[in-house]
Amino acid sequence: MGVKENNLVSFLVQLVLLTVLISIIELFSYLILIIAESPSEKAYKSFPEFISTKPAPFNNVDDFKEVELSYSNKASRCRGKIIYNDQIGFPRYEKDNFKCYGEELRNGVRHTTDQPSNFSRRILIFGGSTVWGSGSSDRNTIPSMIQKKINENTNKKIKVINYGFTTVTINQQLNLLKNIKIDNHDIVIFYDGGNDIFQSMINENPDGSIIGYNQSNKFNIFIQNIKFFLSNTSNTYKLMSVVKSKFNQNELQNCNNQDKEKSNALISDGFEHYISKIKQVNEYVIKNNATFIHFLQPSLFYKDNQYSDYEKKLIEISPLGINECKIYQERVMDGYKYFSNNYKNSLKDLNSNNLINTLDPVRTREEYFIDNLHVTSAGNKVITEEIYMVLKKTLN
């Protein structure tokens, strides 16, 4: 046998031994995870796994199976790639049309159910993934529920259109609005705040975009994607995550950027930027002979109402979702509080509505949030009622 053959055999033997070793470690980790698993709670959960356990917010909804599938890898492949349209300044799916596990895209926008074929007026709703409807099927998004509410309570032919999209801030919403022809008597609704606070407090750039930040930090995002992949495929990685969480006891890390003055400046500047954009939208809509209504969305980052035990646990599991530095958690919580407390006084001459305290599970005995910002259709139903109460004054 020649040198090349010997080297090949040696390489194959080492490869087999490495594969066997990895398999043994994976099996050992799997057994430890099984032993550590209690009847009520797994030792480790990825977000899709968390959804698959059917947490409390899905108790009284009719679209759980569709939502569960929407968080699967199959659904992600079905939807395809998100690209950024630099000319407009707004992201979009590479596909213009798809139908994927309860989510249907038609001509670039998510399908709103029960739309009339003939209509005399439109309601255009802009926002991030909470308007798009992450956590609900097409029929249970906020725009679809508003459409159904209008159909049931008025004899007017009004068409509701869902212009929500994941990660967008008020900057991108305004960009998109300016690229859509507004008709006389249209009603334009902006429902936002969460992504704007995140962009200002975490990415420290209120004028930027979350997708733009991701594109500028591709290496960090690549590492996060690897971690996400391992969290779904490797028992060893899951076990390491469990061990780490036991040592940290879910405490936030004290990073080296505990600059309170900087945080206060980011909060103040972020709020001023947000308010100025809302006013710009209002001026633009009025100039086009339409009506503008703004809503500050609820979140778990801050509210005046008492938190339920479920909400406390949810915050504990994932303080921010991507960054565990204590300063970032404090910024977002303080930022949301600052936005909420100063929102109404800063927009006195505008139809502005603070929905921070809309979702109150302690009072209603029903849960809504599946993470710090997103809700199930149970939450969408409550939010729809609040929006419709404001909207019907304009419709009458």
Language model feature labels by segment:
Residues G2-L21:
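N-terminal Sec-pathway targeting helices
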Residues F11-Q14, S29, Y274, Y343-S352, ...:
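Histidine-centered active-site loop/cap adjacent to the catalytic His
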Residues I22-S40:
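Membrane-interface motif at the C-terminal end of an N-terminal transmembrane signal
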Residues P39-W132, S136-R139, P143-K149, R363-T364:
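Membrane/wall-proximal cationic-aromatic binding patches
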Residues I88-E104, R122-L124, T130-N232, V242:
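Conserved SGNH/GDSL esterase-like catalytic core that processes O-acyl groups on lipids
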Residues I146, F165, L359-R363, F369, ...:
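Catalytic cores of nucleotide-enabled group-transfer and carboxylate-activating enzymes in metabolic
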Residues N195-K344, R363-E366:
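Serine-dependent acyl-ester chemistry module
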